[in-house]
Amino acid sequence: MEQLGKKYEFTEETIEVSERTLHRIKAIRDFGYVKAGELGGFIEKEENLSHEGNCWVYNVAKVYGDAEVCGDAKVHGNAEISMRSDYIVFKNWWSSGRYFTWTRSNNMWKVGCFYGTGEELIQKAYKDSEISGREYERVVRYVESILADEKKRE
């Protein structure tokens, strides 16, 4: 895979959030739907937004602390992300290519217009197709294993 180097830089514009200084970002090359020169949202440090993939922080969205935006994730609007494990975004690689999200705070899944538990997601997916059911089940079980590992460490 070709390394394209940095994709954004900090501008002079800063804001203060939770006693942290966040910097407005600006794209320095084209990637995904972002064009060179486009202003983005605010991040505290480069570790908050990967230079790889098509991930981007838009508008007035804020990312800071231990949070990291990577892959093809997009943070929009007034979103404010400050912890690494607030939620996990996955991509449906087996059919539609759309993104879906698991949220830690309520242990719920959001896929298109579906919103529910992991078990409800698996049941719905198997009704759609054997492949979808199997793949969604795999992802749900992966998240469950992360949670089980965290409980062991407590």
Regions found by a protein language model. Name each.
Residues 55-64, 135-147:
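Short, compact, well-ordered microdomains
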Residues 148, 152-154:
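Acidic/polar low-complexity scaffolding segments in large eukaryotic proteins
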Residues 71-145:
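Glycine-rich hexapeptide-repeat left-handed beta-helix
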Residues 36-39, 56-57, 123-125, 135, ...:
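General "foldedness" signal
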Residues 1-60, 64:
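Extended, small-residue-rich solenoid/repeat segments and analogous flexible loops
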Residues 50-84:
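A detector of tandem-repeat and repeat-rich interaction/domain scaffolds
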